[in-house]
């Protein structure tokens, strides 16, 4: 018998929300139950729960701590956690864009470790943040030097036209 059937038979309501403090290799969620006339209350509880959930997000350029676009993260409730390096599988480029920005691409053969900042981005703010990202940047999995996998900025290959490689520097500087 599934949860939905149990709720209906018992005259209850329920809402499922994702939970990200467990092992991130498998999806995990929590179901909040209440009496059928309490839907508004469990929606409020779910909303509060989601506001406390966050995902680690890696940035290598203009969104780094103290850089010009950091406010795009902090205004959405993101908080700086740490400065770390990626695993040695990335190449970094100074893109030919206005404004100029870095582009990081995965390359397990000629890559190097790149300096990134990790922010905790509230789950409820992810959509608003994604709406601000412009091509050729994209979001993907970024492997850190300690083996963690986090979401972060990457660059699509076509964005490297006329770009200057700065992998040997190991970080982006304004």
Regions found by a protein language model. Name each.
Residues 4-55, 93-97, 123-126, 136-138, ...:
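Glycine-rich, small-residue loops and helix-cap segments
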Residues 55-65, 69:
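GGW-centered surface loops in extracellular recognition modules
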Residues 69-86:
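Short Gly/aromatic-enriched secondary-structure transition segments
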Residues 78, 93-97, 102, 143-146, ...:
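RNA-binding accessory domains that recognize and position tRNA/RNA substrates
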Residues 84-111, 119:
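Basic, polyanion-binding surface patches
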Residues 104-148:
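Mid-chain, well-packed structural core segment of small domains
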Residues 145-174:
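C-terminal edge-of-domain segments
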């Amino acid at each position: 018998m599934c949860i939905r059937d149990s709720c209906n038979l018992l005259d209850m309501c329920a809402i499922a929300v994702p939970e990200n403090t467990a092992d991130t290799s498998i999806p995990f969620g929590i179901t909040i139950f209440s009496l059928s006339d309490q839907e508004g209350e469990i929606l409020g509880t779910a909303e509060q729960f989601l506001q406390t959930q966050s995902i680690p997000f890696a940035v290598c350029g203009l969104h780094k701590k103290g850089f010009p676009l950091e406010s795009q993260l902090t205004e959405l409730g993101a908080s700086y956690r740490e400065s770390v390096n990626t695993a040695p599988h990335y190449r970094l480029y100074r893109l030919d864009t206005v404004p100029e920005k870095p582009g990081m691409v995965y390359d397990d053969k000629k890559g190097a470790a790149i300096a990134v900042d990790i922010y905790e981005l509230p789950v409820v703010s992810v959509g608003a943040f994604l709406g601000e990202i412009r091509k050729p940047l994209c979001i993907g999995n970024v492997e850190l030097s300690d083996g963690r996998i986090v979401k972060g900025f990457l660059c699509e290959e076509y964005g490297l036209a006329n770009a200057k490689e700065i992998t040997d520097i190991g970080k982006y500087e304004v």
